[in-house]
């Protein structure tokens, strides 16, 4: 018997009730009651605008990482440039380009989709669109960073060193982990195909 396609399946269960039970500065919490497999279920989840992120790789196959404070985990975290889809009508690709410029003062001639992910599907509807940026150059504008972005460090690291840090558990930001492993897998696959 052949295996089914490996693909997430969208469903639209019968929704009995949906209400916003908390309004926050950045996201809200919704409570929804719905029917699934004959049962009436109630679930709370973070209602999120979504985000875009960018894995920037320079001509030396080095990956751009930024270090930024994240209060929820009380840590300065290595990440890739990312930001909320909070500008009405802004496309994920445009958001990724904006974040690369705002957080790292860089622009990319090539910005291709890399991977799309749900960050925590058991408790949030957030979707993150991750792009692969190449052919990098200095941006035309310098941004004044404030709050947690005020002391961002932006450095390029060899891809192999970043992959090693991921598998050793030294960096844990899931957007960075997903992006770097996807890019690494694509590069390995490309090398195998060309042998």
Task: Walk through the language-model features, giving the residues of each.
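Short beta-strand micro-motifs in enzyme catalytic cores
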Residues: 28-32, 76, 127-129, 153
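Unchanged
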Residues: 41, 50-53, 84-174, 194
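Generic C-terminal helix-cap and adjacent flexible tail
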Residues: 185-195
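Extreme N-terminal tail/first-helix region
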Residues: 1-23
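Structured adenosyl-cofactor binding patch, chiefly the S-adenosyl-L-methionine
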Residues: 177-186
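Short beta-strand-to-turn element immediately C-terminal to the catalytic PLP-Schiff-base lysine
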Residues: 57, 132-134, 183
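Conserved Nudix-box catalytic region and its N-terminal flanking loop in Nudix hydrolases
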Residues: 10, 46-48, 52-98, 146-148
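Acidic, metal-coordinating catalytic segment for phosphate/diphosphate chemistry
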Residues: 17-53, 58-60
């Amino acid at each position: 018997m052949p295996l089914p396609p490996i693909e997430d399946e969208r469903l639209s269960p019968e929704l009995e009730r949906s209400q916003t039970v908390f309004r926050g500065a950045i996201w809200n919490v919704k409570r929804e009651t719905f029917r699934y497999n004959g049962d009436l279920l109630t679930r709370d989840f973070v209602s999120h605008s979504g985000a875009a992120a960018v894995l920037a790789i320079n001509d030396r196959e080095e990956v751009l990482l930024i270090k930024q404070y994240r209060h929820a985990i009380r840590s300065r975290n290595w990440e890739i440039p990312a930001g909320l889809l909070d500008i009405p009508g802004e496309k994920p690709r445009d958001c990724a380009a904006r974040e690369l410029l705002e957080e790292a003062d860089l622009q990319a001639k090539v910005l291709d989709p890399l991977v799309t992910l749900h960050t925590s599907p058991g408790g949030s509807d957030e979707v993150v669109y991750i792009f692969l940026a190449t052919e990098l150059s200095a941006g035309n504008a310098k941004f004044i960073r404030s709050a947690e972005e005020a002391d961002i460090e932006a450095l390029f690291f060899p891809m192999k060193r970043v992959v090693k840090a991921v598998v050793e558990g030294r960096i844990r930001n899931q957007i960075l982990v997903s992006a770097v492993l996807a890019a690494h897998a694509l590069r390995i696959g490309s090398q195998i195909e060309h042998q």
